[in-house]
Regions:
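Short loop/turn motifs that connect adjacent beta-strands in outer-membrane beta-barrel proteins
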Residues: 1-4, 12-16, 59-62, 75, ...
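Outer membrane beta-barrel
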Residues: 1-88, 305, 315-317, 339-343
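Membrane-embedded beta-strand positions of outer-membrane beta-barrel proteins
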Residues: 3-5, 52, 64, 126, ...
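Transmembrane beta-strands of outer-membrane beta-barrel pores
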Residues: 7-11, 66-72, 140-146, 188-190, ...
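Outer-membrane beta-barrel translocator domains and adjoining extracellular loop/strand segments
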Residues: 15-22, 75-81, 107, 149-155, ...
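Extracellular loop and loop/strand-boundary signature of outer-membrane beta-barrel proteins
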Residues: 34-38, 80, 103, 108-112, ...
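Outer-membrane beta-barrel "beta-signal"
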Residues: 352-364
Length: 364
């Protein structure tokens, strides 16, 4: 039996570019996910937890954890470069509603509801390792939502056009969500194939920002959050191509994702199903000069159909990047990368966010 206690990232499943099972376990830096080619393991942040791993036999492991801390995903601050909402992220204060009947713009404050408990988040896993190198995993998780939902709070005294507007917008995080999952990892020739399937019977699929009219009383009531069944599948591959005429080695990584819900599309936040894929290819050049290795890094992502916020899928949106990375003596690392976003017309909030980034790292 091995154990560790403290702030840590616990990552189960096999997701690469699209959050799956591991996304329920960890809160994340959502702004970092806006950089094309970023893997989910690069955006997760550590949470306080006790983790245990028991080797039952050489081929069977049981894992379990209990989190004693809850933290929400860090979204881009309102008005910052990557922000696409005035109600979510640090600095969110109010939302403005236009009342055309009266020619007015009415502000409503955005307020925080009660945060989920630091307790009540846990998971158990059963892993089976075959002699051939194939691995299977089964998972059961209980977690609190890391992304907020919003509901409108009605003014019971208001009449006329103002009655349908909220007096405040309440930020809410759903508690006690359940996940059931399975994963596999295997080799087919020289290609590593991985995949996972997850099912959440009580995922947040709809939120009502505006108060809702009760036909029996004729009054507007607070908006509601509705749960639904959500199923998600991820399938990925990893392949290292050895010496070629164009590079000393080429690392290929790809993943496709599909997600669906049983709710009617007209009633939910996202589409009733969505799918897309992401690819990266790194061309590596060793010792181009004394102590210096170079890598040309490329990425491409395409939301083929449907939108799903937590998977950063926007219907028909595309993004890609081209970069150069230099490593000196395995300690210094410098990157320059150009990123471009296009497609999806008016619903793609990143269309005007093309950028060039330069980073320098030192390891010791």
């Amino acid at each position: 039996l091995s154990a560790r206690v403290g702030r840590q990232v616990i990552s189960w499943g096999e997701s690469l570019f699209f959050q799956g099972i591991s996304g329920a376990q960890n809160y994340a830096d959502a702004a970092a996910a806006n950089s094309p080619g970023t893997q989910v393991k690069e955006i997760f942040l550590p949470t306080g937890a006790a983790y245990f791993n028991l080797e039952m036999t050489p081929s069977i492991n049981i894992e379990a954890y209990y989190q004693y801390e809850w933290k929400e995903t860090k979204e881009a601050g309102v008005g910052s470069y990557w922000s696409n909402s005035d109600i979510s992220g640090d600095g969110s204060e109010r939302i403005l509603f236009v009342v055309e009947d009266l020619g007015l713009i009415i502000p409503a404050p955005v307020t925080n509801g009660e945060d989920p408990s630091d307790n009540g988040q846990w998971g158990v896993a059963l892993r089976y390792f075959m002699e051939s190198g194939t691995e299977f995993g089964l998972y059961r998780l209980r977690y609190h939502d890391k992304f907020p939902s919003f509901v409108g709070v009605a003014d019971s005294t208001a009449t006329g056009p103002l009655a349908r507007l909220p007096v405040q917008l309440l930020r809410h995080y759903e508690e006690g969500m359940d996940m059931y999952g399975a994963s596999f990892s295997t080799l087919v020739g020289d290609v590593n194939i991985v995949g996972e399937l997850s099912y959440v019977p009580n995922s947040v699929v709809t939120q009502q920002v505006l108060p809702v009219l009760d036909p029996t009383t004729g009054r507007y009531e607070n908006g509601k959050i509705q749960d639904g069944h959500v199923t998600q599948g991820n399938l990925g591959l990893f392949y290292v191509w050895g010496k070629t005429p164009v590079a000393d080695s080429i690392n290929l990584l790809g993943e496709a994702v599909y997600v669906s819900t049983d709710m009617d599309e007209d009633d939910i936040l996202n589409d009733d199903d969505a799918y897309g894929y992401a690819l990266t290819a790194d061309f590596n050049y060793n010792s181009v000069m004394s102590g210096v290795d170079l890598a040309v890094k490329t990425s491409f992502k395409h939301a083929v159909d449907g939108s799903w916020k937590t998977l950063t899928l926007t219907d028909s949106a595309k993004e890609g990047s081209l970069g150069l990375q230099a490593t000196y003596l395995k300690r210094w690392k410098g990157d320059i990368k150009y990123s471009r976003f296009w497609g999806a017309k008016s619903i793609n909030n990143k269309q005007d966010r093309d950028n060039i980034t330069v980073t320098v790292q030192y390891s010791f």
